[in-house]
Swiss-Prot record:
Name under which the protein is recorded: DNA replication and repair protein RecF
Subcellular location as annotated: Cytoplasm
Taxonomy of the source species: Bacteria, Pseudomonadati, Pseudomonadota, Alphaproteobacteria, Rickettsiales
Gene for this chain: recF
Swiss-Prot/TrEMBL keywords: ATP-binding, Cytoplasm, DNA damage, DNA repair, DNA replication, DNA-binding, Nucleotide-binding, SOS response
Presence of keyword Metal-binding: no
PANTHER family in UniProt: DNA REPLICATION AND REPAIR PROTEIN RECF
GO cellular component: cytoplasm
Function: The RecF protein is involved in DNA metabolism; it is required for DNA replication and normal SOS inducibility. RecF binds preferentially to single-stranded, linear DNA. It also seems to bind ATP.
Length: 360
């Protein structure tokens, strides 16, 4: 089994840090500090070496230290392809971010070829009651760990969709070009939908197989394209292209694309109670989310033979003793690089004693 882990992390002008350098190994790491000391900022910096905008989904301008026009994060990382140097540079004025692998520029969506990460933050605990987009992006990040090409597919689809919206905004359409773009969207949609359905099956099996102190979840995708594939319907590509053609006038008025895999929703039920997670208590929602994260991590290791970096922000807060003790024992037993933040070691003394301690 390959372990993805950081050997070192260097941040400059990042959030509240002018300069910070950390040396680490393939072991659990506990970051202790008061609220506002920068614990989550460190996790966010690490998460930038995975497709997307990091665990906060923050605007680039908000990441740079106040009064600084640029910031950077560098890492020496044991990747899927061996030891490598990664860096990301952010410029506030141009609102641009560049990423490098061994001093060569790469696209953000290519990072899943090299790294694998799973994270859980307090902000994610509201995912079941937030918008469809948040849940879909959460699930697509899970798919990245099972299929590294998925990030590139999602990025391509979004590019084609933006092109379509631009064409529709014009007074005169180039029908041939519009038809080509819609066909590309349809083709890419099938790959995205199939990847989601395949991962959904993997994840459900992982949840059902994993015995722990957290509630079982029942997962599903609510999307027209995914449903047609599940039903075994023929020529789904043709159906998507026809729907996009049919909604042109409507989408021109809306200024956006109203149909497609970018509208699918990721639904989660409390299996035992047979109710959607959004109707559960906040405590149950957090427990269900932890169960999903544990299943994702376990099955990613089983399927890809690669152990991801695990980033857990204040994961022990508001857990009862039974679940906190289970997580403590579980995290001590697994062989991967795990980053945990806490204001102090109260209740997790055993975990703190067996991890590298970073005090801010």
């Amino acid at each position: 089994m390959k372990n993805i882990f950081l050997h070192s992390l260097i941040v400059e002008n990042y959030r509240n840090f002018k300069n910070l350098e950390l040396k680490t190994d393939n072991i659990p790491i506990t970051i202790i500090g008061e609220n506002g000391s920068g614990k989550t900022n460190i996790l966010e910096a690490i998460s930038l070496f995975y497709p997307g905008r990091g665990l906060r989904s923050a605007r680039l301008a908000d990441i740079c230290r106040e009064s600084e026009d640029h910031c950077s994060v560098r890492a020496l990382l044991q990747s899927k392809l061996g030891l490598a140097e990664f860096s990301t540079q952010i410029k506030r004025i141009s609102n641009r971010r560049t990423t490098e692998y061994n001093n060569s520029k790469i696209a953000n969506n290519e990072l899943s070829k090299f790294t694998s990460m799973v994270w859980l933050t307090p902000q994610m605990e509201g995912i079941f009651t937030s918008g469809t987009s948040d849940r879909r992006k959460f699930f697509d990040r899970i798919v990245y760990n099972f299929d590294p090409k998925h990030a590139e597919l999602v990025s391509k689809y979004e590019h084609y969709m933006q092109e379509r919206n631009k064409i529709l905004a014009e007074d005169m359409w180039d029908n041939n070009w519009l038809k080509t773009i819609e066909e590309k969207m349809a083709d890419t949609s099938i790959y995205i939908a199939n990847n989601r359905l395949k991962t959904l099956e993997f994840m459900q099996q992982a949840i059902d197989d994993l015995e722990n102190e957290f509630p079982k979840a029942e997962l599903s995708i609510d999307g027209m394209v995914e449903q047609k594939i599940l039903n075994g319907e023929e020529d789904v590509v043709g159906f998507i292209a026809a729907e996009l053609h049919k909604t042109r006038d409507k989408d021109k008025l809306l200024g956006r694309t109203s149909f497609g895999v970018h509208k699918s929703d990721f639904l989660v039920k409390h299996k035992h109670k047979n109710i959607l997670a959004k109707f559960c208590s906040t405590g149950e929602q957090k427990a269900i989310l932890i169960a999903i994260i544990l299943a994702e991590m376990n099955y990613a290791i089983k399927l890809t033979k690669t152990a991801p970096i695990l980033l857990l922000d204040e994961v022990f807060v508001h857990l009862d003793d039974r679940r906190r003790n289970y997580l403590t024992e579980f995290f001590i037993s697994i062989n991967l690089q795990l980053w945990v933040t806490a204001t102090d070691l109260k209740g997790i003394e055993e975990f703190g004693n067996k991890s590298q301690l970073i005090k801010l």
